[in-house]
């Protein structure tokens, strides 16, 4: 599954219980995916999204939070568009919902950015704004030199509001206009990882980080000259770097790490140059390569999330340039 679809699928399944946070997400989603239309003298709200799961999430939230009914219209793909699109439409009480979600102000005028109650909300509200905006019009590319997370915005005011929400989360994002389209862009790999964590896309983060690490190790190996066995060198470097990250992860989590993850981490630290196959054979009872790798990934992800929450250096802080040198 492409990374963008994976993030949206995961976020569409994320359970959020606090009403104010759900409302912030709905407001952002309707603002970034939707529009107000006048049909037969009545205000109609429409929001177009990529996934059926996302459309259902919006529909359920509108019903539970605001008591309004909506319909989902399937738009078949064709031409430049691949796959179906899903339009959530609110016909009855459209104006009431527009006022409740901040699409219209108290005088009935369209709000160009995001409503002040959302902009000035809690940190969890800021996370919800990004979740809603990404579900509406976000994209995530493969990690590498040109990796990026982008959200297409309905206008410059909405883009600046999204940048402000990112800033409140400690995330550096930039608003740009490209060929007349306003976008908010993040290109730094660590920043993308931090925002995926903030939005709640933990499963996709693990996949993204694994691909990122693989590409970084490959790029480092390609830069090494006159080495007879590049694959062996690359594996050894990756193992040493992983050992350093695990060491930091155990330090961050302390006694709060699950026993099975702690055991896998201690194996990695004790045998820093061993391959994953060798670590699996050293385990008692023995484990497969995939099992030991999965536990280490979960340990690192848990520690990086804790570090992000506490505002302290992540596991990457333990990886030094010397580890990648001969």
Swiss-Prot record:
Species of origin: Renibacterium salmoninarum (strain ATCC 33209 / DSM 20767 / JCM 11484 / NBRC 15589 / NCIMB 2235)
DNA-binding region coordinates: 275-308
TM helices/strands, residue ranges: none
GO biological process: cell division; regulation of sporulation
UniProt GO MF annotations: DNA binding
Database matches in InterPro entries: Homing_endonucl (IPR027434), Sporu_reg_WhiA_N_dom (IPR018478), Sporulation_regulator_WhiA (IPR003802), Sporulation_regulator_WhiA_C (IPR023054), WhiA_LAGLIDADG_dom (IPR039518)
Gene: whiA
Intrachain S-S bonds: none
Alphabetized Pfam families for the sequence: HTH_WhiA (PF02650), LAGLIDADG_WhiA (PF14527), WhiA_N (PF10298)
Record function comment: Involved in cell division and chromosome segregation.
Protein's recorded name: Probable cell division protein WhiA
Lineage per the UniProt record: Bacteria, Bacillati, Actinomycetota, Actinomycetes, Micrococcales
Family: Belongs to the WhiA family.
Domain of life: Bacteria
Keyword tags: Cell cycle, Cell division, DNA-binding
